[in-house]
């Protein structure tokens, strides 16, 4: 399918900022890896800085040259399936025409500057990562900077894609002591979590964020206890997870349940989908995404993980499993290259 990207626009680099430890991005780093070093450009000046303006120009000129068109599910869907979705839309319907953002602040702010987590998932890290007192102070200082530079205009806060918001001392205290007066234009908070600590007691300890938390992503990557505890979520407790998911299902929050597809779990894609739908019903969207190498695998190890690769010895089995689910409702993915757009069958 021939798609001319000059006819399309992606709004993400024009309204989003993702803050990591010492660096910033304007999209998910695996989808658009260009970064801005905060040691070179201070946080208060970063949003209309030259590197970010350059990224926006690559969207405006239709090249999308910095984007990973395979890993981004929206570009993958457009290029392989001919469907514009999410932040990607037809350019003529958009009012985006300049690489400069008027108020020099993002609408959508991703807080990814604390990697603290109680799990050591092989797809993310090789050991437990927990900030010490110095690291906690750094996290708190960055939150203070956000309060000073961005809080007046930001509309959505995303906490967090780097660790877990309930495990992180800095993020947990931020949620517990959240002051809405500092964020007059805030519409929503999106929580990204493994849900291991998201129980009623924890939720009741942060009442000021309740009306803002309208969406969440829960990263699970397994459909059975064995895979969850021994392969994809090392340190996890399956029964605790299920109990917390049932609690979360009682909240007025839309849920994205995510599953990173790899050699150790692809046989459970259908089981995972059915489990999530049985708990959350129609308010869940289930995402199946290709595993990304965040530096935890050697080249050879990562090749074995990529079960969707046509040269992988189990690729035919992956296709068989994917065929069971890809037409399901409330499901999205970045595996569109395996779908024949003419007769809507797997290639």
Residue ranges and their predicted role:
Residues 169-177, 200-207, 268-272:
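Distinct, well-ordered alpha-helical segments
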Residues 15, 70, 75-78, 82-83, ...:
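Preference for well-ordered, secondary-structure-rich cores of eukaryotic proteins
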Residues 47, 172-176, 229, 245-249, ...:
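Non-transmembrane alpha-helical segments in soluble domains
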Residues 105-116, 127-141, 153-169, 181-199, ...:
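Core AdoMet radical
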Residues 1-134, 300-347:
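N-terminal pre-core extensions flanking Radical SAM catalytic domains
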Residues 44-45, 54-56, 121, 125, ...:
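A generic structured-segment signal
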Residues 60, 145-152, 175-182, 205-209, ...:
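Leucine-rich repeat
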Residues 21, 156-158, 188-190, 211-220, ...:
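Conserved C-terminal portion of the radical SAM core fold
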